[in-house]
Amino acid sequence: EKNTPDSSLVLEKGTVSDAYYELLKGRTLNTTIAYGVNDSNSYGTSYIMALTYVSKSKDLTKATGDEVTDIPSDLPKVTRAKNGKPSINMNGYKGSSKLVPQALIKGKGKEVTNNNTVKVKYTGWLLDGTQFDSSWDKNTTLEADTYSGGNHQVIEGWQQAMVGQTGGSQVLMVIPPNLGYGDTVQGAIRANSTLIFVVDILAAY
């Protein structure tokens, strides 16, 4: 399809090599660049690559959109700091045997399909309120595939919950054990745990 990228690239320091970053930064749309590679990362194989820029976007740093007001009252209550970092009150919630993807903020970006890579910030808790992971605390983002076999694999509950959401959204995910880690212990996550995530969708590629 015309002007539709075959692939996407996050261009920022730390995600690509310094040489690659300097080569690509500042280029305008419809520019084509050809370059040769023969270094320690090419496994002894030289090759030439050509890139054409057909579109670009600037990723968000936190969820941005309209607050959702019709949230079921029995779900955990989420509040946010000024920088967007979420906190949670479990509100006596006991979990669900089914996946619950509840938008808290409805973004105005593209709709996520089952063939996307999504850039997110997230925090995860157990039902007792114990936080077991947070990209906010690490000042990082995560890339997650909504399909199997990609380079950025996440649990099945994440894959299913993100499809149909929109860029800029913040989503509360209740993930039952069978769509999480099942009977496997995963660090601070006990076997057969229901997982609660709040996920900000910053971009979808």
Protein language model annotation of sequence segments:
Residues E1-Y205:
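Cross-family detector of peptidyl-prolyl cis-trans isomerase
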